[in-house]
Design a protein with these regions (language model features):
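Rossmann-like NAD(P) dinucleotide-binding subdomain of oxidoreductase/dehydrogenase enzymes
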Residues: 45, 89-256, 278-281
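NAD(P)-dependent aldehyde/semialdehyde dehydrogenase
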Residues: 275-386
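Structural signal for terminal/edge beta-strands and the immediately following C-terminal loop/tail
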Residues: 457-489
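Short acidic active-site motifs
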Residues: 10, 188-189, 374
């Protein structure tokens, strides 16, 4: 099968079909959208063997990991569909007061889908953040049509997933233009899509360079559109001394497993470990060194990532004050990422912005602070993050409110005595954060609230009842939550 880049005319045709289908699909019932998402999940399950086999060949990921990721993807589709039908995200609201003098208008408001959405799949999650992943699921739940640009690192996997979506659309007797799948390894294809005047929003998971480029292209349009890009994070972990004294070995085991999970190719990998000088830190470092040496190198996703990891690691280790204190005792083979553990003083880290950047792969830094004041300086210097973690006793946390306030302003998820890897799919999850972790910190990419990225408010004033959606009509028996005069019914 050919995976050659789409031409400009092919892109035009896809976008035109998507835009035409939006006029109908945007008016579909919530039950219809739920049915579609469940149908996609069902088709993915039917094609499990083919999907996992293709992804294993294209990504070097083990089949156990891929099966677990496919389970997550199926759950996302089903849970987003169920949330869609419950309708809380519509934020239905009615304001009227017949007794008011002078007479006030009747205002009713809800959320409507924005239009065709372009989704750029990620390389490190070929199912959950790719063709049939969370961005596609949440956009379809919102009532938007979707065009997915397949990631060039796993085109066959994406093609199989796309066929599952197309089969589900046919099963539900919906328009084929609801979904389109395009190929393009060149930047040109990505630019054509994001700059097309009929595209209303963009979702992206990947590098800072890629996400920022899409954001800039969208801003250059005559009518700019939102770009929801999840780009990267170093996910700092602050280790307070009392907690470290209690469990240095356990914490080292947790963090060494976390930073090397999936060969360090998780956007939530803990890439900075910050602590104050103390004997417990020495014990922690000794244990981290021992464990890092024992972890074997493994295949990275593709040759491009291996090259970037190797060159970035060499660059970081060459910086002033950076000490390579441990690496895997096994030599890395072709295409493999070797676990690396470095240490640097807070003063050297603060002076060097390069050390603040993400290194995608099994690499982490221990930052040694002289005292609590220096630890606060490190927190102040952090850019936006997907996660920040505090390892502390409760009494330490109570006494560290300034640190906590700093971390709250710099991340989308604040973790207490845990590790950042592992992102639960649930409504309360927020997988996002301030720039440069994402381009819009108000929204997340995981959990049903991800639907909110692709909707906008619309208010109706003095509109005839029979022309309104059922859930905005005065006497509706709808189960959809709604506000009446500011009070939820």
């Amino acid at each position: 099968m050919s995976y050659s880049d789409f031409t400009r005319s092919q892109i035009e045709e896809c976008v035109a079909k998507s835009y035409a289908a939006f006029s109908t699909y945007s008016q579909s019932t919530l039950a219809t959208r739920n049915q579609l998402l469940h149908a996609i999940a069902n088709e993915l399950e039917k094609q499990r063997s083919a999907l996992v086999a293709a992804a294993a060949l294209e990504t070097n990921l083990p089949e156990v990991r891929l099966n677990n990721e496919l389970n997550r993807t199926i759950f996302q589709l089903e849970s987003y569909g169920d949330a869609c039908e419950r309708g809380y995200w519509l934020e239905a609201s009615i304001d009227q007061d017949a007794s008011a003098q002078p007479v006030k208008p009747v205002i009713k408001k809800h959320m409507i889908p924005m239009g065709p959405v372009v989704v750029y799949g990620s390389s490190n999650f070929p199912f959950a953040y790719s063709t049939a992943g969370g961005d596609t699921a949440s956009a379809l739940a919102a009532g938007c049509t979707v065009i997915v640009k397949a990631h060039p690192a796993h085109p066959k996997t994406s093609s199989i997933a796309a066929s599952c979506i197309e089969k589900a659309i046919a099963t539900c007797q919906l328009q084929s233009g609801i979904f389109a799948h395009v190929y393009g390894a060149s930047f040109q294809v990505g630019e054509w899509l994001v700059k097309h005047p009929l595209i209303s929003a963009v979702a992206f998971t990947g590098s800072y360079t890629g996400g920022k480029q899409l954001f800039d292209w969208a801003a250059q349009r005559a009518i700019p559109v939102p770009v929801f890009a999840e780009m990267g994070s170093v996910n700092p972990v602050f280790l307070l001394s009392e907690k470290l004294e209690q469990e240095p070995t356990l914490i080292a085991a947790q963090l060494s497993a976390s930073y090397t999970l999936g060969v360090g190719q998780f956007c939530t990998k803990p890439g900075l470990l910050i602590a104050m000088e103390c004997e417990a830190l020495n014990l922690f470092c000794d244990e981290m060194i021992k464990l890092t040496k024992q972890i074997q190198p493994s295949q990275l996703l593709h040759a491009g990532i291996e090259h970037l990891y190797r060159t970035k690691s060499e660059q970081l280790i060459a910086q002033k004050g950076v000490e390579l204190i441990a690496q895997s005792e096994q030599q890395a083979g072709v295409g493999e990422g070797k676990p690396l553990l470095t240490r640097v003083t807070a003063s050297d880290w603060l002076e060097n912005k390069l050390l603040h950047q993400e290194n995608f792969g099994p690499y982490t830094q221990i930052i040694v602070c002289k005292n609590y004041a220096e630890l606060l300086l490190v927190a102040q210097a952090l850019e936006g993050q997907l996660t920040c973690t505090l390892m502390a006793t409760v009494s330490e946390a109570k006494a560290s409110q300034e640190l906590i306030r700093l971390l709250e302003q710099r991340c989308g998820r604040l973790i207490f005595n845990g590790v950042p890897t592992g992102v639960e799919v649930c409504k309360s999850m927020h997988h996002g954060g301030p720039f440069p972790a994402t381009t819009d910190s108000r929204f997340g990419a995981v959990g049903a609230d991800a639907i909110k990225r692709f909707i906008r408010p619309l208010a109706y004033q003095n509109w005839p009842e029979e022309l309104l959606p059922d859930y905005l009509q005065d006497n509706s028996l709808t189960s959809i939550p709604r506000y009446r005069n500011g009070v939820i019914e």
